[in-house]
């Protein structure tokens, strides 16, 4: 999974770091489903070069994956940072363990293959940025980022993140294109949108799901150890009955929900609840829901929470795109799609001579850790020997 470097490099007010979601509005996200002129990857990188320049290492190709150049800056960023992470968390001698070396190599391969695939797919499918998106989410965001670091921002990024300014911007472009590829495939009108809707609809139908909205009129809270009084229960019933009468008289059910519903979970389920008989809803709620026909409204249904007024709704493909099941199916399908596309990409041999400086840089860091470790051990041994000698003299 890609992570935006703009977020990981962003300082909080107390000098730390924070994860920042890169949110774009739906109108902009859907730009790639229309025929408007967009800034595609190659044009975006020309604009990046105009803004921050490009070092030789930013253009130096060390291998090709799927016909896409992997540059030295790109390879170095992952190789050096991953080496440091492995050394910091698994020990300076991690390279002596085959399983760790295999994990390291797999992580490098996955990162480079993913970035190459993003470039390849965005080129093939014409996925890019509107001018406003590019100016706001890339260029202006970059300006805001480096403003936090002052005049020495370039050296700071190099020292802390092992990254050039050119590749920093390229990485952010790739991160946002990754999200846009997903939107291109799964937003309404996307290549895989109808397939995922059908998969989700089939799942609901095959597993006997219902969809309902409800109005909960809650019992009043009672202090621990006390019980709800008959008077409190009657007052709640009367209020719920008045709302039920409004619903049966034809008043808009959604408007009644907005006005009277006391279910805290309703806000995160605006299109209703989808469930089958294995769900954790109370049995009375489930029984009443399954007894209804589509469009029918229940009588008052009592549970430990209060009184429910339930309306059963149809399960159709227009609404299921907002369900957790649709999202889960989309994510699973996207993973499969990415894995399949990665498997199709051919790779040229890595030019090991060209990347040797990055390897040396990573090894230098590991050697520093080893030296610090050895010096600490030596100091401990010397202290122990001195303590032993002093103990003998004391005797």
Stretches with model-predicted labels:
Residues 69-73, 95-116, 128-132, 167-176, ...:
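Soluble non-cytosolic domains of exported or imported proteins
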Residues 242-283, 313-314, 318-320:
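Peptidyl-prolyl cis-trans isomerase
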Residues 24-165:
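N-terminal targeting/tethering segments
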Residues 67, 74-76, 133, 216-221, ...:
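A mature extracytoplasmic/lumenal domain signature
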Residues 12-21, 25-57, 105, 154-232, ...:
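PPIase-associated folding chaperone regions across multiple families
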Residues 4-8:
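C-terminal motif of bacterial Sec signal peptides marking the signal peptidase cleavage site
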Residues 79, 83-86, 108, 112-116, ...:
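Sec/Tat-exported extracytoplasmic proteins
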């Amino acid at each position: 999974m890609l992570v935006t470097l703009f977020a990981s490099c962003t300082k909080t007010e107390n000098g730390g770091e924070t994860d920042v979601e890169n949110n774009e509005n739906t109108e902009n996200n859907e730009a790639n489903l229309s025929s408007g002129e967009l800034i595609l990857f190659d044009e975006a990188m020309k604009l990046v070069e105009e803004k921050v320049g490009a070092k030789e290492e930013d253009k130096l190709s060390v291998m090709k994956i799927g016909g896409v150049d992997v540059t030295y800056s790109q390879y170095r960023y992952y190789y050096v940072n991953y080496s440091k992470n492995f050394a910091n968390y698994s020990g300076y001698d991690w390279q002596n363990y085959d399983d760790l070396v295999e994990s390291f190599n797999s992580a490098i391969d996955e990162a480079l293959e993913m970035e190459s695939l993003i470039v390849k797919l965005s080129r093939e499918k014409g996925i890019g940025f509107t001018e406003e998106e590019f100016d706001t989410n890339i260029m202006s965001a970059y300006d805001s980022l480096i403003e936090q670091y002052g005049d020495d921002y370039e050296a700071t990024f190099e020292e802390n993140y092992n990254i050039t300014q050119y590749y920093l911007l390229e990485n952010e472009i790739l991160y946002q294109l990754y999200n846009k590829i997903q939107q291109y495939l799964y937003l309404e009108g996307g290549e895989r949108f109808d397939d995922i809707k059908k998969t989700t609809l089939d799942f609901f139908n095959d597993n006997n799901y219902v969809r309902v909205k409800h109005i909960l009129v809650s019992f009043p809270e009672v202090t621990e150890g006390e019980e709800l009084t008959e008077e409190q229960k009657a007052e709640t019933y009367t209020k719920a009955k008045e709302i039920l009468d409004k619903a049966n008289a034809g008043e808009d059910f959604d408007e009644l929900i907005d006005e009277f519903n006391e279910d805290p979970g309703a806000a995160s389920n605006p299109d209703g609840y989808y469930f089958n008989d294995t769900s954790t809803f109370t049995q009375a709620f489930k029984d009443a829901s399954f007894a209804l026909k589509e469009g029918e409204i229940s009588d008052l249904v009592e549970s430990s929470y209060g009184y429910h007024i339930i309306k059963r709704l149809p399960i159709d493909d227009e609404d299921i795109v907002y369900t957790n099941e649709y999202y889960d199916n989309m994510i699973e399908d996207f993973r499969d799609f990415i894995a399949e596309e990665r498997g199709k990409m051919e790779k040229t041999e890595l030019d090991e001579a060209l990347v040797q400086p990055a390897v040396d840089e990573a090894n230098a860091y590991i050697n520093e850790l080893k030296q610090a470790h050895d010096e600490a051990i030596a100091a401990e041994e010397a202290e122990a020997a001195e303590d032993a000698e002093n103990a003998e003299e004391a005797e």
